[in-house]
UniProtKB/Swiss-Prot annotation:
Pathway: Cofactor biosynthesis; coenzyme A biosynthesis; CoA from (R)-pantothenate: step 1/5
Protein name as it appears in the record: Type III pantothenate kinase
Gene name as annotated: coaX
Active site: 111
Organism this protein belongs to: Borrelia garinii subsp. bavariensis (strain ATCC BAA-2496 / DSM 23469 / PBi) (Borreliella bavariensis)
This enzyme's EC code(s): 2.7.1.33
Amino acid sequence: MNKSLLSELIIDIGNTSIAFALFEDNKVNLFIKMKTNLMLSYDEVYSFFKENFDFNVNQVFISSVVPVLNKIFENIIFSFFKIKPLFISFDLNYDLTFNPYGSGKFLLGSDVFANLVAAIENYSLENVLVADLGTACTIFAVSRQDGILGGLINSGPLINFNSLLDNAYLLNKFPISTPTNLLERTTSGSVNSGLFYQYKYLIEGVYHDIKKIYKRGFNLIITGGNANLLLPLIEVEFIFNIHLTVEGIRILGNSIVVKFVN
């Protein structure tokens, strides 16, 4: 990769994985992940950067829900790129085309916040329901007029699957996959069906209910690393965007309002 090309590096530090996205000309040209490990060392992360990031960047924006790793990444980015990264969060001031806090400010994970901002800023939509299937399953609604309306947080597919394996003595581990039928006749098939149909009904149920509650139409956007196995089951119209979170982080990073103190 051309080392002279200036780019934006977006990092999403999640509970299960850490996503890295390189933006060039407003497009994602590189998207890779590494497994999250609370014991990650400086040398491990530096080696990962050296192996994968043979380019220069002029900006680095980070969203993190694992604060214990923040300092390592801040130090490595400064050492590697000679710049200080900007950490985005819900409680900073941003210059956006809508007010996310129209319904009042409340504590919100930076990844969820990034999803909701990207849903409004990147699409010509007025009301959006965003479902993110990662370590957690988050389902939040946002409106261009009213801001963030709120949402639900549940455990994600892999958390549920591993919890079942840990607590069912006779159940052996097997690869999860999209179920072919609602009613299956094998144990593994029935587990797959139960695992993914619960999210289908949860997402579709929330989608239909918020339309009744708010008496308006909503668009559904689905994202998250575990979403691909669920998509064939969804029976309402939706947009799938695997890069939604990093796009939102980038928007927020470029929209931070810096206050100068005399």
